[in-house]
Amino acid sequence: MLAEIEVNGRFDRDPDLYFLTVFGDPSLDSNWALRYEGHHLAYNWTFVSGVGIASSPQFFGSNPAEVRAGNKAGTRVLAAEEDLGRDLVSSLSGDQKGAAILDIDVPGDIFTAAEKEISPLENSGISYQDLDSRQKRMLIALIDELASMQPDVIAEARMETIRSEGLDDIKFVWIGGIETGDPHYFRVQGASFLIEYDNTQNNANHIHLVWRDFAGDFGRDLIRMHYQACLLYTSDAADEGLGVD
């Protein structure tokens, strides 16, 4: 379908061009990584012995976001994410919208693009603590929808981490129109994570959606913990005269 849309496009579109890559030696007692990616899809898992599993960056896209002609007309990809975000911003009061909706041009793509390492974006938007009880449930449902694109054990760990960090300061930002079909962007930013969603290209029918971890993309935080533990073990062993080289 995309090949038909992008006549004479820059790239050859082929549904078989998705690749699984293994880095390192997969085992329970080693550090290794697994990547599955292709156009509009990127999963990254880093397995760190004795520490845990990192699951970001995570990227999804769809062009078109909604099929508008032919026998698949009406089919939507990433529909739940778009609808949950729009339902939340539409539920806000006037004052709440003043905090959540930024009066700037809609970006042409997500702000973090394909950066290998990211930092928190501007601390703007409406806070979880400034939502009513129904809106709070809507925001958590939006976050959970993105977390649940992972296996259950990882999704549950993500949500547990987010709750343990505290929900009150999580920020929701919207840019653009709130009616269906309007070019729009939204993000959810917490202490350790960032969700960005953009639907502005191709007449607002082309989605980019990403989950990032400020410290843990590609397992950076887990690898750091692993090496700190190794250094501590080596130091303790040397102190005890165990002859560890």
Question: Where are the regions a protein language model picked out?
Answer:
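Acidic/His-rich structured neighborhood in mature extracellular/periplasmic domains
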Residues: 1-117, 121-124
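Conserved small/polar residues in nucleotide/adenosyl-binding loops
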Residues: 233-238
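Hydrophobic alpha-helical segments, chiefly the membrane-spanning helices
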Residues: 244-245
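Alpha/propeptide regions of enzymes that mature by internal proteolysis
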Residues: 88, 126-133, 138, 221-232
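Extended, compositionally biased non-globular segments
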Residues: 126-201
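Short loop/beta submotifs within extracellular cysteine-rich repeat domains
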Residues: 96-97, 148, 203-204
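Long, His/Glu/Asp-enriched segments that create or flank divalent metal/ion-associated functional microenvironments
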Residues: 28, 32-41, 45-47, 170-232
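Short amphipathic alpha-helical linker/capping segments at the junctions of internal repeats
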Residues: 1, 157-167, 213-222
